[in-house]
Amino acid sequence: DETGIPIILQAGPSCRAHTPIPILGKMFRYLASQTKTNICCHVDHGYTLDECYEGIDSGFTSVMFDGSKLTLKENIKISKKIASRAHKHNISVEGEIGFVGYDNGKISEGTNIEDAVTFANKSNIDAMAISVGNTHLQTSKKASIDFNKINLIEAKTKIPLVLHGS
């Protein structure tokens, strides 16, 4: 409360592996109710429609659907369904286009700019995670972020962009 800085309480896949989404939703909402600070209660990297629906139904204020391993058509289809349900409850939706890799794991594939434009225009999401050289769980001090690609995507879309990792 002292700083007034908004906070995101996030439940990623490793957290959800140990604690069910309904319990996390109640816990996060309780914590948020104990402060005047703006708190976002976020399901991060929901990989299925049902997982995101469960987050919506469990009191989260934001969900992220990670359809980055799906075809563009399937990613749009599922993201649109999630956004339709979420928006009825004033819940924001983040989608991901272009796989973001992991440190010492599968490398980032990079977001295709035209796919990003199509995804932003057709999925009805509120924010879009992109792959531009960023890496989850990065431990090195040097990142190879493609700022030119970020600028090109930003110029062609009217949606807030999100970078995971790095």
Kindly label every feature range from the protein language model.
Residues D1-C15, I21-C40, G46-L163:
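Alpha/beta enzyme core
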